[in-house]
Amino acid sequence: MSTEIQTELHQAVELRRNFAIISHPDAGKTTLTEKLLLYGGAIHEAGAVKARRAQRKATSDWMAMEQQRGISITSTVLQFEYQNCQINLLDTPGHQDFSEDTYRTLAAADNAVMLIDVAKGLEPQTRKLFEVCKLRGLPIFTFINKLDRPGREPLELLDEIEQELGLQTYAVNWPIGMGDRFKGVFDRHKQQIHLFERSAHGSKEARDTTVELGDPRIEELLEEDLYYQLKNDLELLEGVGPELDLDLVHQGKMTPVFFGSAMTNFGVELFLKYFLDYALKPGVHISSVGEVPPTYPEFSGFVFKLQANMDPKHRDRVAFIRVCTGKFEKDMTVNHARTGKIVRLSRPQKLFAQERESIDVAYPGDVIGLNNPGVFAIGDTIYTGQKLEYEGIPYFSPELFATLRNPNPSKFKQFQKGISELREEGAVQIMYSNDEAKRDPIMAAVGQLQFEVVQFRLQNEYGVETILELLPYSVARWVEGGWEALNKVGRIFNTTTVKDSMNRPVLLFRNEWNCQQLQGDHPELKLSAIAPVFSSQTVE
């Protein structure tokens, strides 16, 4: 590798940060996302989703159904710069039905920000997504939100994180007051108090007054009880809390904790500054040829998301690629690991929610959008140089099933196209009956809202009205060894056999008990709750 390329890659990696936000619905994730963009200069005024004023729609919620309902239901990539760093924010769906899309997004992230509502603490969806982050070994940064409202004691929340998630905590800053009396935060590293001034509904950057801890003005600026509460809390933290250990943070064993209010912008910029200092830069990825560092000179990346109709005017399809190694250049030709084909990557785009602009180069940690004329599938690896392939992205086991009918024969082509494209982008899993007379697709989902999204998008983007009929199943299991293994067993009971989009056998059960009964009757039949990951090479 030439010295120039090595230096270029090293500098690019040093200046990149990549993260996803995980939270329970309504913890304020879309609001925090907007405020980070506000401080990054990517937008000039934040528009809260739930605000009843005539503010504009939230930047990250771009799909028609998201803007109607005020919830995030598809992951979005938002890229912006702050203090010379290139930041890739992978905005994930907040709704619990969309854990599959979130999982795929976390596969492309280097860090995770866990957002917690100060009044509610840890909630079910947060715990579930934390487990995914833990499996991937992601560093987790915690932002405790909504301090402008009444909530639980900060020390109680730290204890809950430690006890329930097994994470050590280190409070990087500490709140002064709460609810109507929330005045600001104390920066433990710099020993400074930041007192905030409210901006117009939080749509502009918050102004703050910074005061050193020993400054005699503190007692004038703070009410007496808040000042003494702060002193007592800090003494307790220094006495019993651990020191910040970035090695433990990067191993996912300690979480730096920040307090603030995304709605009013209090504490958001402080969080962003420390995040850039503490977060992992783009690192090594496990591949079929072992660990590959980001400064490896050959280009490689993987597809973690597909999205149809991001621009309804053009009926386009975009593949989201996480760059892992080397330098991406416009019009370069790459190898497509799954098919062995050579693909020319023309018209690459920098993504910003629904908006896009052309780019010429990209580096490890970046996410680029490529027009996808049916070439890419989720989990695909593209590369130059020596053949390599990254680990695939598995599917979650669905729990809800329904047949989807198109009552209008004249819309057959649009129906087939819509189902195919929505399946490819992972909006829902599609299965088919083994009975050739039953041609209607079977949708398989993690939650009910996925069905609603598919029906809405088929009508909104493809002009097809559909009829949904729920099926009485709640458990799906893939057969290891495929049709050959299943046929050896012979006739089986209390299950329905279907095939997935890759023609692999899947057994559907009404309940977990029926599934366990089958496994007891046929121990030779190996069943899996996760679809086998297709890969032309195994990972060493």
Swiss-Prot record:
Keywords: Cytoplasm, GTP-binding, Nucleotide-binding, Protein biosynthesis. InterPro entries: EF-G-like_DII (IPR053905), EFG_III/V (IPR035647), G_TR_CS (IPR031157), P-loop_NTPase (IPR027417), PrfC (IPR004548), RF3_C (IPR032090), RF3_dom_3_sf (IPR038467), RF3_GTP-bd (IPR041732). It is found in: Cytoplasm. GO terms for biological process: regulation of translational termination. GTP binds at residues 23-30, 91-95, 145-148. Residues 14-283 form the tr-type G domain. Increases the formation of ribosomal termination complexes and stimulates activities of RF-1 and RF-2. It binds guanine nucleotides and has strong preference for UGA stop codons. It may interact directly with the ribosome. The stimulation of RF-1 and RF-2 is significantly reduced by GTP and GDP, but not by GMP. HAMAP family: Rel_fac_3 (MF_00072). This is Peptide chain release factor 3. It comes from Nostoc sp. (strain PCC 7120 / SAG 25.82 / UTEX 2576).
